[in-house]
Amino acid sequence: MSITKDQILEAFAAMSVMEVVELIEAMEEKFGVSAAAAVVAGGAADAGAAAEEQTEFTVMLTAHGDNKVAVIKAIRGATGLGLKEAKAMSEAAPVAVKEGVSKEEAEALKKELVEAGATVEIK
């Protein structure tokens, strides 16, 4: 007996957000792929043209480190989240702390989180 697409969708609908994140990570590992959106090159672009400089960045918390309280405070300050939400975000690493920010803002947030003891990436 095979599972139908509808049954898979129903199983997804019954999962919590954390369970879906864990499932996606397991699928990425098993199939050797990334869930990040693929960038499609424009057909009219010249092959020798330089890549357009990125203007929006995402600050990713990859680990909260040993000083979890300081990291939670930094997340709260940067995002305006409540204590419970900031704690959940720090525990869900890797997670996007802020998306669509300027390079300067991303660098400043990264510095703040690293000083608090977190491991951070800018994408």
Curated annotation (Swiss-Prot):
Protein name: Large ribosomal subunit protein bL12
Originating organism: Shewanella sp. (strain ANA-3)
Domain of life: Bacteria
Family: Belongs to the bacterial ribosomal protein bL12 family.
Role description: Forms part of the ribosomal stalk which helps the ribosome interact with GTP-bound translation factors. Is thus essential for accurate translation.
Keyword Methyltransferase: no
KW Cytoplasm (keyword) present: no
Gene3D superfamilies, A to Z: 3.30.1390.10, Single helix bin (1.20.5.710)
Subunit field text: Homodimer. Part of the ribosomal stalk of the 50S ribosomal subunit. Forms a multimeric L10(L12)X complex, where L10 forms an elongated spine to which 2 to 4 L12 dimers bind in a sequential fashion. Binds GTP-bound translation factors.
Record keywords, A-Z: Ribonucleoprotein, Ribosomal protein
GO-annotated cellular components: cytosolic large ribosomal subunit
A single MF term (Gene Ontology): mRNA binding
GO process annotations (BP): translation
